[in-house]
C-alpha cells in the first residue's frame, strides 16, 4: 500500500474557498442606477403663472438635456436642449420663447397658458453616450379672482343680481303709482261739474226742502153779507186767510 496522501499546508481544503466565494457573491449586490423623475412646481398652476418642471435624482455625468412635449422623446417635438460643456440653451421646433433649461436639467415655463398643459419628457445623455428619459405632467387651470374662492365669487354675483331685481321692482312700483295717480286726476279734471238749479247751490250741497203748498184760489176777502149784524163780520181774522 502506498503512503497516505498528505493534507494541504495550513489545514485548509480547496472546497472551503469555494464556499466562502459563493457566500460573498450571495450577499453582494452590484450598484444600480437610480431612475430620475420629473416633478411640477406647483403641481397645478393658474393661467399666467410660472411653473418649474424639476428634474430629480439627476446624475452628475450628464452631458446634455433635451426636453420634448409628449409622453416620449421619440417622435415628439423638441422644445429646448442644454449642453453642459458649452452651458448654452438650444431652442427646438416647439420653442415659444418662454422656456428655459437650467444646468441641472429643470425646465422653467413662464406665463403658462391652457394650451401648455400636458405631458413633457426629459431625455438625458451621459458621458458614455447612454440615453435615459422620464416624463412629467403639467396641469393648468383658469385664473379666478385673486384672493376670493369660487364660493365667494358666486355669492357676490348672486347678491348683485338680487339687488338689481329689487331696484327694478321698486322703479316699476313707483312708475305704476305715479301713472295711476295721474290718471285719476285727469279723470277728475275731465268730468263736468253737476248742473245746479236756479236759486240752489250745487247738487252735493243742496238740501231737501218740503214741497211748497199749491197756491189756493184767491178769494175775495169780502163776501155777501148773510147776516145783517155787522159785528159778526168784524170778528173775522183776515190775516190768517192771507197767510194760508
Curated annotation (Swiss-Prot):
Signal peptide span: 1-35
GO biological process: phagocytosis; regulation of immune system process; signal transduction
Note: To study the function of the orphan receptor CEACAM4 chimeric proteins containing the extracellular bacteria-binding domain of CEACAM3 and the transmembrane and cytoplasmic part of CEACAM4 has been used.
Function as written in the Swiss-Prot or TrEMBL entry: Granulocyte orphan receptor that acts as an trigger efficient phagocytosis of attached particles.
Subunit field text: Interacts through its phosphorylated ITAM domain with the SH2 domain-containing cytoplasmic proteins involved in signaling processes during phagocytosis.
Cellular component GO terms held in the UniProt record: cell surface; membrane; plasma membrane
ITAM, short sequence motif: residues: 222-236
Entry's transmembrane regions: 156-176
Spans annotated as Disordered: 186-215
UniProt tissue specificity: Granulocytes.
Residue span(s) of domain Ig-like V-type: 36-139
Gene Ontology molecular function terms on file: protein tyrosine kinase binding
Cytoplasmic compartment segments: 177-244
PROSITE patterns in UniProt: IG_LIKE
Processing after translation: N-glycosylated.
Family matches, as InterPro entries: CEA_cell_adhesion, Ig-like_dom, Ig-like_dom_sf, Ig-like_fold, Ig_V-set
Record membrane topology: Single-pass type I membrane protein
Protein name: Cell adhesion molecule CEACAM4
Topological region Extracellular: 36-155
Keywords: Glycoprotein, Immunoglobulin domain, Membrane, Signal, Transmembrane, Transmembrane helix
Gene: CEACAM4
Main localization of the protein described in the UniProt heading: membrane
Compartments reported by the entry: Membrane
Listed CDD domains: IgV_CEACAM_D1
Chain positions carrying an annotated carbohydrate: 57, 104, 111, 126
Record-stated family: Belongs to the immunoglobulin superfamily. CEA family.
